[in-house]
């Protein structure tokens, strides 16, 4: 059976991400890696994160990418001035610096294509993966894209999940919270990697699904 790993919010921490994948996970061609979004912004090397994912795919590794609210803001900033202002205030300025451009309109097409191909939801036999969570008060939670990208607190509808495990990121939580979570819905994997100077935060987490084990790398960016 192939190994399955789910990785939390990276936010431009490319060195930390590379260490997690190459040294801690020791990625294999048979693995399935799911990333929960927010690859960019705030951290020092958004470009490096995306380049690494593209490189892994080109080498034949199985990397699946969800869309985070930061990728959504980047895409919306192409056409919406308010979204652009919000994105820049929330770390988009560091992303542009990393890509070596002053405007989203100057971003290389391969990066825009990467962001546009990210998925709102990934479902497997055992998992429902989203960036932020699900709004179970909606008649169809999987169609509420706003909530999928932005929701913070949400009660779980176990009947709706029907035995699947809901895993998300988006809302940074301290290490003690992340490692003490029971193996049941919802599991939050956002350890606030980019906030390494904030006590209790600053770790990038991955979940080895079938072994039910967390893997942690402290921010080295």
Residue positions per predicted region:
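Active-site neighborhood of divalent metal-dependent phosphoester bond hydrolases
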Residues: 42-123, 154-155
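Short, glycine/charged-enriched secondary-structure capping and boundary segments
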Residues: 19-22, 48-51, 79-82, 143-144, ...
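Active-site neighborhood of phospho(di)ester-bond hydrolases with catalytic His/Asp-centered motifs
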Residues: 7-8, 33-37, 64-69, 166-171, ...
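Acidic, His/Gly-enriched loop-helix segments that form or flank divalent-metal centers
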Residues: 89-188, 192-202, 209-214, 219-220
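A general structural motif
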Residues: 1, 28-31, 60-62, 125, ...
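Short, glycine/acidic-enriched loop or turn micro-motifs at the edges of active sites
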Residues: 11-12, 41, 71-72, 134, ...
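Conserved protein kinase catalytic core
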Residues: 15, 43-44, 75, 137, ...
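N-terminal active-site segment of His-dependent metallophosphoesterases
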Residues: 1-52
């Amino acid at each position: 059976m192939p190994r399955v790993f789910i990785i939390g919010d990276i936010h431009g921490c490319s060195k930390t991400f590379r260490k997690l994948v190459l040294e801690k996970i020791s990625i294999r061609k048979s693995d399935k890696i799911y990333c929960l979004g927010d690859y960019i912004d705030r951290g020092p090397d958004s470009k490096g994160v995306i380049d690494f994912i593209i490189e892994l795919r080109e080498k034949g590794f199985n990397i699946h990418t969800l869309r985070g609210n930061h990728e959504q803001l980047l895409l919306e900033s192409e056409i919406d001035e308010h979204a652009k202002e919000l994105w820049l205030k929330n770390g988009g300025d560091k992303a542009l610096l990393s890509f070596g451009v002053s405007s989203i309109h100057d971003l290389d097409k391969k990066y825009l294509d990467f962001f546009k191909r990210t998925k709102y939801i990934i479902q497997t036999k055992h998992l429902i993966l989203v960036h932020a969570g699900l709004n179970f008060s909606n008649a169809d939670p999987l169609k509420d894209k706003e909530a999928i990208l932005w929701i913070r607190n949400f009660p779980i509808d176990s009947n709706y999940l029907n035995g699947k495990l809901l895993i998300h990121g988006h809302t940074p939580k301290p290490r003690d919270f992340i490692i003490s979570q029971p193996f049941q819905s919802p599991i939050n994997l956002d350890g606030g990697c980019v906030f390494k100077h904030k006590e209790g935060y600053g770790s990038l987490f991955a979940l080895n699904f079938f072994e039910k084990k967390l893997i942690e790398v402290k921010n080295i960016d």
